[in-house]
Amino acid sequence: MTNQAPIPVIVNGAAGKMGREVIKAVAQAPDLNLVGAIDHSLEHQDKDAGELAGLSEPLEVPITNQLEPMLGYVAGDRQSPPGVIVDFTHPDSVYDNIRSAIAYGIRPVVGTTGLSPEQIQDLADFADKASTGCLIIPNFSIGMVLLQQAAIAASKYFDHVEIIELHHNQKADAPSGTAIQTAQLLGELGKTFNPALVEETEKLPGARGSIADEGIRIHSVRLPGLIAHQEVIFGAAGQIYTLRHDTSDRACYMPGVLLAIRKVLALKSLVYGLEKIL
């Protein structure tokens, strides 16, 4: 047992599907304390975060759309450990959210995807100057990390690979951050994939997907009924090797989210990817 005060946690995007899962997970963790729930949807303003997340009892934490005052409130509490904000919002707002949090000394744990490489580098520089930890994690599933590690191992033996990512039809960005990260991990191996065998012609633009790092193509599917799924398909003469990860419940991300909340306090810079803290 420890007498250390629990870590103050703000959830941004609290009314979303991932936000509600994070609220439940944080509320059930004895070393964490939900102190704020932010959401810009007017429909949910002033509702209790616990009730909105489906908990049996209210948490007495109202939903608010005021991010800056909440950051200031948590930053000013000198009796508690440094605060953490978990961000599952939107690609259009996440960059500003992260900069604001770092400016207040609040450690961001970011699951929102859609940041450009230039934005990530700028945030990394900002976090370095502030000596403040920040985690940007495209996918919090430990199973997805294992898939990516298996893909790295397989890439030593296959020259041809493509990625298919499938998500629910309310996902705003494509390709997914996880698919881009998977391609980046393979691209960092210093190997060029998919050597051209014929001159291809796309009868419809984009029919062959987008080209990511080192010639790896990514294909995106958006349909109702899906949550989050990814295939990495390797091909060679006479064989196909397929790696696939399926998410059937968003609860699968919560062990990774809780791990990130606890780990980010010890960081002094921006770290990208769950695999870096496992």
UniProtKB/Swiss-Prot annotation:
Main localization, broad class: cytoplasm
Compartments it resides in: Cytoplasm
Broadest EC class assigned to this enzyme: oxidoreductase
Enzyme Commission designation: 1.17.1.8
Catalytic activity reported: (S)-2,3,4,5-tetrahydrodipicolinate + NAD(+) + H2O = (2S,4S)-4-hydroxy-2,3,4,5-tetrahydrodipicolinate + NADH + H(+); (S)-2,3,4,5-tetrahydrodipicolinate + NADP(+) + H2O = (2S,4S)-4-hydroxy-2,3,4,5-tetrahydrodipicolinate + NADPH + H(+)
Pathway(s) served: Amino-acid biosynthesis; L-lysine biosynthesis via DAP pathway; (S)-tetrahydrodipicolinate from L-aspartate: step 4/4
Gene Ontology biological-process entries: diaminopimelate biosynthetic process; lysine biosynthetic process via diaminopimelate
Amino acids binding (S)-2,3,4,5-tetrahydrodipicolinate: 168, 177-178
Keywords of the record: Amino-acid biosynthesis, Cytoplasm, Diaminopimelate biosynthesis, Lysine biosynthesis, NAD, NADP, Oxidoreductase
Residues of the active site: 167 (proton donor/acceptor), 171 (proton donor)
One GO MF term attached to the UniProt entry: NADP binding
Gene3D superfamilies for this protein: Dihydrodipicolinate Reductase, domain 2 (3.30.360.10), NAD(P)-binding Rossmann-like Domain (3.40.50.720)
Role summary: Catalyzes the conversion of 4-hydroxy-tetrahydrodipicolinate (HTPA) to tetrahydrodipicolinate.
Entry similarity comment: Belongs to the DapB family.
Protein name: 4-hydroxy-tetrahydrodipicolinate reductase
Species of provenance: Nostoc punctiforme (strain ATCC 29133 / PCC 73102)
Protein's gene: dapB
